[in-house]
Each structure stands twice: as C-alpha cells, then as structure tokens.
Amino acid sequence: MSQTIKAVMFMSGAIVSFSAMAVAGRAISFELDTFEIMMYRSIVGICVVLILGRMFGTLGQITKRNLGTHFIRNISHFAGQNLWFYAITVVPLAQVFALEFTSPLWVLLLSPLLLNERWTQMRVLAGVMGFVGILIVTRPTGQSVNIGVIAAALSAIGFAGSAIFTKRLTRTETITCILFYLTVMQLAFGVICAGYDGDIAMPSLDTLPWLVLIGFAGLLAHFCLTTALSLAPATVVMPVDFIRLPVIAMVGMLVYAEAIDMWVFIGAAIIFTGNYMNIWSETRKA
C-alpha cells in the first residue's frame, strides 16, 4: 500500500471525527459558549494524551525545541476552531463545511512558501475543481452573506495555517508531542478567553457525554490529520477533506432536517473527481 493511500485512509478517519464533533458541538452550543467548549474539550484531550502516552511509553518524546512553531500552529487552530464552532450554531452544516473547505486552497497557495512544496498542474486542478464545487454548493449571494458565513470562511484560513505548521512539525516532532502541545495550549487559550468576563459556566450532566465525545473526536481527528500529513504532502492530504461536505450534508438532513438539494451532490461530485484525479496522479509517482 502506497504512502498516499495510507494518508487518504487516515484523512477518512479525520472526516468521520470532525463530523461527529460538529454534531456534538451543536448539541451543547445552547449551554456553553465556544470558548468554554474549547476549554472543556482540551481538558478531555490532555487526559487522553497523558493516559495513552503513559501506556505506550511515548511521553518522553515531548520536547521543547519547537515551542514557537507549536504556539503559532495552535493560535491559528484556536482561532479557526472557535470561528467554526460559532458558525455551526447559526449556519446550516453543509454551508459551514463548504466554506471551511476553502482551507485546502489556502494550503495550496501557502505550502510552496512555507513548506517548500511545489505546485503541480494536477494539484492546482484539484484545488480549482474543489473551489468550483464549493461555489456550486453554496451559491453565495448578497443576501446570504452574514456573520455566520463570514466566521465559517475565516475559520478556513485558521485551519490552513494549522495544517501547514502541523506539516512542518511532523518533520521533527512525534505525534504524541504535537498532540500534547495542542491540548495544553488550547486549554490555556480557552481558560483565558472563557474567563475574561469572570464567568465560566460549568457543564451539566446532560452535556458531559457530548463534551467527552468532542474531546475524543477532536483528538482522533488531529491524530488522523497529523499522521496523514506525515505520510504525504499537504497539497495532497488537505483536498481529500472536501469529501466531508456531502457527508455532513447528509448528517444535517437526517439529524437536523436541514434542506438539501441536487446542487450539493453536483458540487460534491466535482470535488470528489478533483480529489480522485489528484490521488491517482500522486499514486502513480509513488
């Protein structure tokens, strides 16, 4: 099995995990704000990382040599994640994910500058096809642009920065190290932002299972994403995430009765085709 195919399989795990996190995040959004959700999610994440690190003997892999890169990576991710959690509470899930999926396009544009990865015709074509698919799904108009849509679009830039610096970290750091600093720094950011008004809400018994799900799903998503980025270039890995759009569109329809039409599937078909062509091209090179 080629490294590219392995990376795609791990990205599939990330897609399922991110979708589960969206459902759980919406379920508790009426009780906790986005900063509080991020804070409690990070507490769960730290516990999981420390327990698994102790079990597998990988805690010794946590180093301080790239703290600056970890900080930039997690600031970028924290901003993107909070904007994303806000957007899923006010905008249909399919539209949030569609706008978020401009993230691979930012990765495509920035990777040659920050990671020294090169553009290829197929990678650019996959990115363009993904963007065209997103426009078909969302069909943005002047009336459709609101604060939730803007938040979803801005979250994509944050996630792109996170992906790029994650890729840089995978060159020298282990997954345990990356996930440890992810959870610790996100917790620190969450406490500061959630407590700025002196009032941090405690979760109820009803929301605890959802918070645990968010914590586990978020950590699993980042494990899969980090592993995928260690196996293949960011310009190959990130466009695979486009497949999450039709998945979450179906979730929105089945769970929240959100309207879905043929344009979602037409756009998704274009997105999938672009991804398939890119993966096929990279697999032939391997």
Give residue spans per PLM region:
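Transmembrane alpha-helical segments that form core, pore/gating elements
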Residues: V23-R26, V49, Q143-P203
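Juxtamembrane helix-entry segments on the extracytoplasmic side of multipass membrane proteins
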Residues: Q3-A7, T34, M39, I62-N66, ...
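Hydrophobic/small/kink-forming positions within alpha-helical transmembrane segments
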Residues: I15-V23, L50, N74-N82, P104-L109, ...
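C-terminal transmembrane-helix exit sites in multi-pass transporters
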Residues: Y86, S103-L125, P246-F265
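Helix-loop interface residues and adjacent transmembrane-helix termini in multi-pass membrane transporters
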Residues: E31, A87-V90, N116-R118, T172, ...
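Membrane-interface interhelical linkers
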Residues: M1-V16, I46-I72, Q121, E173, ...
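Helix-helix packing/entry segments at the starts of transmembrane helices
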Residues: V96-T102, L169-M185, H222-M253
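Hydrophobic transmembrane alpha-helices of multi-pass small-molecule transport proteins
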Residues: M122-T138, W263-E282
